[in-house]
Amino acid sequence: MTVRTRVAPSPTGDPHVGTAYIALFNRCFAQQHGGQFILRIEDTDQTRSTDQSEQMILDSLKWLGLTWDEGPDVGGPHGPYRQSERKGIYRQYAEQLIEKGHAFKCYRTSEELDALRAGLKESGENRALKPSDLELPADEQAKREADGAPYVIRMRVPTEGRCEIHDMLRGPVELDWALVDAQILLKSDGMPTYHLANIVDDHLMEITHVIRGEEWLNSAPKHKLLYEYFGWEMPVLCHMPLLRNPDKSKLSKRKNPTSILFYQRMGYLPEALVNYLGRMGWSMPDESEKFSLTQMQEAFDIQRVSLGGPVFDVEKLSWLNGQWLREQSDEQFLDSLLDWAFNRDYAMKIIPHLRQRVETLSEVADKAAFCFNGMPAISEASFEHKQYSADDIKVWLQYLLWTYEARNDWNREGLFADAKAIADALEVKIKDFLFPVFIAIAGTSASFSVVDSMEIIGSDISRARIRHAIEVLGGVSKKQMKKLEKAYRDLPVG
């Protein structure tokens, strides 16, 4: 048997360090066993998936050295490797389940589903919706079918008993069938959900080991059941502990920069970031803190993974990155510096905005410094405004941060539209509203267009700088945050 592992990111935003973390452990496991590592793109969410995001994922993983044997860019015998290009395959298997009596068409409306869930809550029943709750009387089913009403395909699940899952790290895990819902397999637009697509793809792509985040452990009974329904052998499951913020909460962009691009633009070495991710819940046999990808692959043993939630601490990553930098030769350091600071693609984004604003090349370093720096050197005094207080400005920035955190695509038109919508809702002139954004992003209001600047430096650095500015202005307490969240929800935006 050839060991085959995979990573299957969704191209719905910036490439996440969590994707790199899972890719790293999948790649190391495959390498350890002389196997193959596959990259598959989960782009079934057509409203949020973008080609730009997919390319950033590919570029970021390559930058880290986490290359793959098969994937959408390199091809392979099990393609296509984008789920959107496999739509017909999923429908074929979903209909096969209906024919075998393992799935059914569900014509329930969203209002009916809400009422069913409310009924369960009122009755105090601690269980999920089951086929018996969802199936309509035969005459009503026939009527909706004849009317061409939209439907989804759901799987049948047991109503009682327990399901035992074997996990490589945890051993046997028991889960209650009562809490497992009649999962949607095929949506009304014909696209599959994660649950159907991954089982079908993992089988057809001959995946032998599924190494994924522990958030999928509760879904494992559905997956085991689908393998049984199809009569397929189930891959070995291994659920990795989730990355955590220093406060032990799940790693999220609201508390920590999560984009690989952020760390690339901030000047972290790819070797250091891979090294740090390798220490997330795993350790070398000799307990060494600094090691290369090659060294990790040679010493890798999945059983050395600890189930305690590994903490992703940027300060510790910075310390480790410093260790890597200090051990470089002068030539290596110069090469790293030139590759980072004079990256041609990045520089070409800046130059069109810079060329019109300088008279000598010696001015470039000062005017473009914010494109290369970390956090701008700002104070509360930097935000002084004739008409608005620091508290006013702090609220604006918090509203803008929340809006930008919800944005999937990152372009100047969308960024400006978001800022304008909030300014209009607050009845603030856009010029006044953008003043503190200039300060937060560039450290000065004497810069080229702030939306152009944010598009250039990217989403994670932009959000991190706005978050930093809010802290400089005194931050927001938990009590204030609740009030602001309500006020933000009530904003007449859009």
Curated annotation (Swiss-Prot):
GO-annotated molecular function: ATP binding; glutamate-tRNA ligase activity; tRNA binding; zinc ion binding
Binding residues annotated for ATP, in chain numbering: K253
Cellular localization per UniProt: Cytoplasm
InterPro entries, per database record: aa-tRNA-synth_I_cd-bd, aa-tRNA-synth_I_codon-bd_sub2, aa-tRNA-synth_I_CS, aa_tRNA-synth_I_cd-bd_sf, Glu-tRNA-ligase_bac/mito, Glu/Gln-tRNA-synth, Glu/Gln-tRNA-synth_Ib_cat-dom, GluQ/Sye
Keyword Transferase attached: no
GO annotation, cellular component aspect: cytosol
Highest taxon of the lineage: Bacteria
Reactions catalysed, as given in the entry: tRNA(Glu) + L-glutamate + ATP = L-glutamyl-tRNA(Glu) + AMP + diphosphate
Main localization of the protein described in the UniProt heading: cytoplasm
Family: Belongs to the class-I aminoacyl-tRNA synthetase family. Glutamate--tRNA ligase type 1 subfamily.
Subunit structure: Monomer.
Protein's name according to its UniProt entry: Glutamate--tRNA ligase
Species name: Alcanivorax borkumensis (strain ATCC 700651 / DSM 11573 / NCIMB 13689 / SK2)
